[in-house]
């Protein structure tokens, strides 16, 4: 497998500051780092790969075997843009040429796709996976040619680590089983890469999130997730702080979480779109602790926290409702927090009503917002 044409191995070395005796330190874990994309490709992947390698070396925690995009793929033809002075006859010629170029690309791309499929069949075989302690999906997108997705998920359940960075949640969209494992699936990113967004840490003492201030701002692209997310499966550690962010949407946006998956462990973080994120020491510490936890190097709480998520969901709806109705956001938030503190199950009980708002267009939410505000203001 090491001679494969696009599986590249980067061996980690002992960390600075480790005990002098090698016998006292666990061996570095072997992680398969997958950065293949069949959908959108993030430019930050090229920044992230050497950062991960150096993180493995400096901590002595792991070394990386990279499964990368194979070389030699021809660029896809770009559709023509019609100029104002283009005649109908000339435009028809341009469209016809584009269609011919598309057909030629599809024919030429078959060999590349076959090579990609063959490499995945080799690397994701049961024999190959036995050599790894876990896998990192590094901003993967689309349907990867994993030969047996169910077998791969069972491999994680057997006691392996799965670490997902950023667009790992934009992978295998049609697979409910994969979505269940990773915790959610991409459903847009209203909070763009150029904006500085606000975040809240739900457990400041949790090692995977302890490096962040309890409330902080960060410049990165933030995903929202579709309705397949199951709060009863996840322990969310970091969420978008909707009241301090723009736009204000009436739903919870988890950002980093952990979960047990059979005997395996899953760590997923949405951070990682921007190059600058990967260079930040705080994010690198977040990565290192998340990877170490997923590998079982230390124990930390992973039991689901649906009540915490329900409370944050309600706060997000309150923030959106206050903005839409010009109500006093701070006063509403204070009342909601007081009720949550008195009865944590109260917000959970409102979840069905809150979920219904997500299916409404912004212009149709007024009645639903009024109902939520009335619930918050009840004595």
Residue locations for each model-derived region?
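Bacterial N-terminal signal peptides
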Residues: 4-15
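Sec/Tat signal peptide C-region and signal peptidase I cleavage site
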Residues: 18-22
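Extracellular ligand-binding/catalytic regions of CAZymes and related secreted enzymes
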Residues: 23-29, 35, 43-46, 50-59, ...
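Structural recognition of the beta-strand scaffold that forms the well-ordered cores
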Residues: 30-34, 64-66, 133-139, 156, ...
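Solvent-exposed loop/turn segments at secondary-structure junctions
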Residues: 37-40, 70-73, 140-144, 162, ...
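Glycine-rich, highly charged phosphate/nucleotide-binding loops
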Residues: 93-127
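Catalytic beta-strand/loop cores that center a nucleophilic Ser/Cys/Thr
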Residues: 99, 119-120, 131, 184, ...
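A glycine-rich, often tryptophan-bearing local segment used as a flexible ligand/cofactor-contacting loop or short
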Residues: 128, 137, 141-211
């Amino acid at each position: 497998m090491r001679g494969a044409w696009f599986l590249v191995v980067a061996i980690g070395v002992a960390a600075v500051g480790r005990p002098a005796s090698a016998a006292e330190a666990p061996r570095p874990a072997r992680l398969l780092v997958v950065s293949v994309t069949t959908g959108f490709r993030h430019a930050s992947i090229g920044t992230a790969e050497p950062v991960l390698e150096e993180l493995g070396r400096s901590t002595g925690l792991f070394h990386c075997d990279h499964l990368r995009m194979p070389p030699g793929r021809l660029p896809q033809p770009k559709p023509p843009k019609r100029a104002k002075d283009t005649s109908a006859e000339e435009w028809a010629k341009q469209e016809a040429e584009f269609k011919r170029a598309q057909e030629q690309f599809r024919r030429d791309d078959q060999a590349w796709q076959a090579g990609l499929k063959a490499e995945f069949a080799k690397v994701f075989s049961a024999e190959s996976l036995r050599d790894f302690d876990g896998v990192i999906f590094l901003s993967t997108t689309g349907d990867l040619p994993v030969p047996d997705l169910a077998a791969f998920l069972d491999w994680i359940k057997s006691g392996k680590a799965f670490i997902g960075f950023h667009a790992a949640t934009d992978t295998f969209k049609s697979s409910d089983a994969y979505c269940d494992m990773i915790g959610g699936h991409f459903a847009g990113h209203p909070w763009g890469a150029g904006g500085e967004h606000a975040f809240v840490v739900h457990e400041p003492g949790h090692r995977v999130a302890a490096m962040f201030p309890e409330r902080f701002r960060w410049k990165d692209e933030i995903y929202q997730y579709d309705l397949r997310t199951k709060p009863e499966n996840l322990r969310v550690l970091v969420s978008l702080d909707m009241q301090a962010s723009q736009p204000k949407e009436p739903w919870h946006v988890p950002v980093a979480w952990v979960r047990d998956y059979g005997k395996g462990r899953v760590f997923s973080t949405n951070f990682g779109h921007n190059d600058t994120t990967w260079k930040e020491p705080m994010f690198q510490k977040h990565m290192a602790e998340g990877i170490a936890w997923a590998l079982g190097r230390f124990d930390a709480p992973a039991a689901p926290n649906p009540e915490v998520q329900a409370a944050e969901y309600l706060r997000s709806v309150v923030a959106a409702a206050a903005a839409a109705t010009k109500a006093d956001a701070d006063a509403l938030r204070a009342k909601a927090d007081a009720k949550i503190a008195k009865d944590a199950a109260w917000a959970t009980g409102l979840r069905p009503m809150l979920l219904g708002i997500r299916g409404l267009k912004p212009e149709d939410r007024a009645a639903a917002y009024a109902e939520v505000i009335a619930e918050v203001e009840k004595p």
